[in-house]
């Protein structure tokens, strides 16, 4: 009897200690709106199954309850906000340098520990080491690859002329994947059989799907649960295929003379990583993870950015004509275009269209951080240490308090210089911002803008899909519930 009483007392003490350790969390729950989730599952089931991951469900909730609220992903509480003031506080804070543990663990299962998944001082050291691979002169050396691969894409689109509306997203993904792999791993990657038959591309896409499951349903990160649902076998299969390809490339490069490569080849991510490996600043496993994660992060984001810009211009032909006239002024002839960085800098209206596309359809819809210390937000709310704060980029960039009553409408005039000057700097953060912004944002803009120049100089685009019917779905890269198809008409000038 005494033993039972002691066990009950001990259990009660542990339970009280547990509740006391979470007292700041419970205080936060009283300050912010939000609904309790299901045990173990949180709000994920409701969001993924009932709302089917529709971004509009978050928008509706914020419109009703305010720009900042609490949710539960599994057993993890998370603060979600679309307030630019809070976004600035979080993204510039030295106590919010780490991505959320939940997101990091999900990404690490897919791609190992590289720049996207490292935390704290390890991330800062790696970022410093990898910055030279993304400096301006290196990006300029990639222009021949951008031009060559976009010419191949244009030739594919040429076969679509007069054929009615076609799915173009899959071709854009192939284009972006070809660019991402060559600028990361070197141009010889295209000689791999798995590259030519799209096998490795499909493997990367499968890995992305598994990653989003691991983020939104975190209990499947457990290997036992993952095996039970058959996900562990898929993860190992995909990881094995990707590692095999990258290791084959690494073996060749590690055993070859650097003098055998041209200057642009030596500036790729893989050669920068090899340099760090030879200086004992990176392990062989980290080298492979860095290369894999760079490809994974780059190819779908650029493809979707170009796709969404083309879709919007097809839906709004008056803006498409303005872009075409600007491009035609710089490139009177459609054939044989070799786009330079100087050319890209002069296309001001195209810049506005691209920025407006990134505002309405940011490639990555959210950016999550974990607090290293208690953090007081601009609204006076204190976020406890160890809490995840997710910046809802999609809804931040459609926040009517900063973008006006027409925030959901396509309007490139939003990026006139005077309007940019008067707007909160964190109301537009398509590549995140602050201390841990996207290392490849200039790369993404340059490759996307160049592709738009060549496509729009050659073709007039049309679609029967109305703008009002676009429905956005949460994913690693923002997706559409139904993807509009495009019709191509060759420009005669």
Swiss-Prot record:
Keywords: Endoplasmic reticulum, Heme, Iron, Membrane, Metal-binding, Microsome, Monooxygenase, Oxidoreductase. It is found in: Endoplasmic reticulum membrane; Microsome membrane. Its main location: endoplasmic reticulum. It is a peripheral membrane protein. CDD domains: CYP313-like (cd11057). GO terms for cellular component: endoplasmic reticulum membrane. Signal peptide: none annotated. PROSITE patterns: CYTOCHROME_P450. InterPro entries: Cyt_P450 (IPR001128), Cyt_P450_CS (IPR017972), Cyt_P450_E_grp-I (IPR002401), Cyt_P450_sf (IPR036396), Cytochrome_P450_Monoox (IPR050196). Its EC number is 1.14.-.-. Its cofactor is heme. Heme binds at residue 438. One of its GO terms (molecular function) is heme binding. It comes from the Eukaryota. May be involved in the metabolism of insect hormones and in the breakdown of synthetic insecticides. Belongs to the cytochrome P450 family. This is Probable cytochrome P450 313a2. It comes from Drosophila melanogaster. The gene is Cyp313a2.
């Amino acid at each position: 009897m005494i033993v039972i009483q002691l066990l009950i007392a001990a259990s009660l003490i542990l339970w009280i200690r547990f509740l006391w350790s979470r007292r700041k969390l419970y205080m936060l729950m009283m300050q912010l709106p939000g609904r309790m989730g299901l045990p173990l599952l949180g709000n994920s089931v409701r969001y993924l199954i009932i709302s089917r991951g529709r971004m509009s469900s978050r928008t509706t909730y914020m419109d009703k309850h305010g720009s900042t609220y609490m949710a539960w992903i599994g057993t993890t509480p998370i603060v979600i906000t679309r307030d630019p003031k809070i976004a600035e506080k979080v993204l510039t804070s030295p106590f919010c340098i780490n991505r959320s543990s939940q997101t990091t663990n999900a990404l690490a299962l897919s791609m190992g520990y590289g720049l996207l998944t490292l935390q704290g001082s390890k991330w800062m050291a790696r970022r410093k080491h990898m910055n030279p691979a993304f400096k301006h002169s290196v990006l300029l050396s990639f222009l021949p690859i951008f031009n060559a691969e976009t010419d191949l894409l244009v030739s594919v689109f040429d076969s679509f002329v007069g054929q009615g509306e076609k799915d173009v997203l899959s071709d854009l993904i192939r284009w972006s994947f070809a660019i991402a792999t060559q600028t990361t791993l070197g141009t010889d990657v295209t000689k791999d059989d798995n590259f030519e038959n799209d096998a490795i591309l499909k493997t990367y896409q499968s890995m992305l799907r598994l990653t989003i499951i691991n983020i939104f349903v975190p209990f499947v990160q457990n290997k036992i649960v993952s095996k039970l649902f058959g996900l562990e076998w898929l993860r190992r299969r995909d990881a094995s295929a990707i590692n095999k390809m990258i290791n084959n490339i690494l073996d060749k490069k590690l055993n070859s003379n650097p003098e055998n490569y041209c200057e642009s080849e030596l500036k790729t991510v893989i050669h920068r990583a090899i340099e760090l490996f030879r200086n004992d600043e990176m392990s062989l496993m980290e080298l492979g993870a860095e290369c894999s994660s760079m490809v994974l992060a780059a190819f779908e984001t650029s493809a979707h950015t170009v796709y969404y810009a083309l879709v919007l211009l097809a839906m709004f032909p008056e803006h498409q004509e303005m872009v075409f006239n600007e491009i035609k002024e710089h490139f009177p002839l459609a054939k044989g275009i070799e786009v330079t960085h100087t050319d890209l800098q002069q296309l001001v209206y195209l810049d506005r269209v691209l920025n407006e596309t990134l505002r309405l359809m940011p490639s990555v819809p959210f950016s999550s951080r974990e607090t290293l210390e208690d953090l007081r937000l601009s609204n006076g709310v204190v976020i406890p240490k160890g809490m995840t704060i997710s910046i809802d980029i999609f809804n931040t960039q459609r926040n009517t308090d900063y973008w006006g009553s027409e925030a959901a409408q396509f309007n490139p005039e939003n990026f006139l210089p005077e309007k940019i000057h008067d707007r909160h700097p964190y109301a537009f953060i398509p590549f995140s911002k602050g201390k841990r912004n996207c290392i490849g944002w200039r790369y993404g803009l340059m490759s996307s803008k160049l592709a738009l120049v060549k496509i729009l100089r050659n073709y007039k685009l049309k679609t029967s899909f109305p703008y009002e019917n676009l429905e956005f779905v949460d994913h690693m890269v923002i997706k559409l519930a139904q993807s509009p198809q495009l019709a191509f008409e060759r420009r005669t000038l």
